[in-house]
C-alpha cells in the first residue's frame, strides 16, 4: 500500500496495532537485547547460536516496529458506531448477504490491517467489498471472480461496533 493511499481502520483495529507496537517496543525488543548482550559476552560470535538468532530476531522486530509506526501514522480511524444510519454500504458496515448458492453470510468491511476470514472481516479494497460499497440494502450486486460471475443480494446493512 503506497503512502498516498489512506489507511482506513476501525477503532478496534487501530488499538490492536497500537497494542502490538507497545508489546514489541516495551517487552520483546528489550528481552532480545538482553539475550544478544549476554550471548555477545560468550566469546566467538560466528558460531554462537544465541547471538545469531538474537540479532536476526532483533532485525525482524525492528522491521515490524517501523511498519507498525508507519501504518499508525497513516491511519484514518473510522468508527462505524458514529456513522449516521443508512442502508448504503460504506467502510465499517456489517453487511448481510445472500450468495448465489443460497447461503446467507455476514461480512464486516474493515481496514487492510484487520482482515480476519474466520470472523468474516474483509478489506475495504477486496473484490467483494468493492462491489458492495455504495450499494444499498435490497440491491443485487455482481462479483466477477476467476471462477465466474456471482450475483449477491444485500439483505441488511448495519453500522455497529466491530471488535
Swiss-Prot record:
<keyword id="KW-0238">DNA-binding</keyword>
<dbReference type="GO" id="GO:0032784">
    <property type="term" value="P:regulation of DNA-templated transcription elongation"/>
</dbReference>
<keyword id="KW-0804">Transcription</keyword>
<dbReference type="InterPro" id="IPR023459">
    <property type="entry name" value="Tscrpt_elong_fac_GreA/B_fam"/>
</dbReference>
<keyword id="KW-0805">Transcription regulation</keyword>
<dbReference type="InterPro" id="IPR036805">
    <property type="entry name" value="Tscrpt_elong_fac_GreA/B_N_sf"/>
</dbReference>
<protein>
    <recommendedName>
        <fullName>Transcription elongation factor GreB</fullName>
    </recommendedName>
</protein>
<dbReference type="InterPro" id="IPR018151">
    <property type="entry name" value="TF_GreA/GreB_CS"/>
</dbReference>
<dbReference type="GO" id="GO:0070063">
    <property type="term" value="F:RNA polymerase binding"/>
</dbReference>
<dbReference type="GO" id="GO:0003677">
    <property type="term" value="F:DNA binding"/>
</dbReference>
<dbReference type="Pfam" id="PF03449">
    <property type="entry name" value="GreA_GreB_N"/>
</dbReference>
<comment type="function">
    <text>Necessary for efficient RNA polymerase transcription elongation past template-encoded arresting sites. The arresting sites in DNA have the property of trapping a certain fraction of elongating RNA polymerases that pass through, resulting in locked ternary complexes. Cleavage of the nascent transcript by cleavage factors such as GreA or GreB allows the resumption of elongation from the new 3'terminus. GreB releases sequences of up to 9 nucleotides in length.</text>
</comment>
<dbReference type="InterPro" id="IPR006358">
    <property type="entry name" value="Tscrpt_elong_fac_GreB"/>
</dbReference>
<dbReference type="Pfam" id="PF01272">
    <property type="entry name" value="GreA_GreB"/>
</dbReference>
<feature type="coiled-coil region">
    <location>
        <begin position="54"/>
        <end position="76"/>
    </location>
</feature>
<dbReference type="InterPro" id="IPR036953">
    <property type="entry name" value="GreA/GreB_C_sf"/>
</dbReference>
<dbReference type="GO" id="GO:0006354">
    <property type="term" value="P:DNA-templated transcription elongation"/>
</dbReference>
<dbReference type="InterPro" id="IPR028624">
    <property type="entry name" value="Tscrpt_elong_fac_GreA/B"/>
</dbReference>
<dbReference type="InterPro" id="IPR022691">
    <property type="entry name" value="Tscrpt_elong_fac_GreA/B_N"/>
</dbReference>
<dbReference type="InterPro" id="IPR001437">
    <property type="entry name" value="Tscrpt_elong_fac_GreA/B_C"/>
</dbReference>
<keyword id="KW-0175">Coiled coil</keyword>
<comment type="similarity">
    <text>Belongs to the GreA/GreB family. GreB subfamily.</text>
</comment>
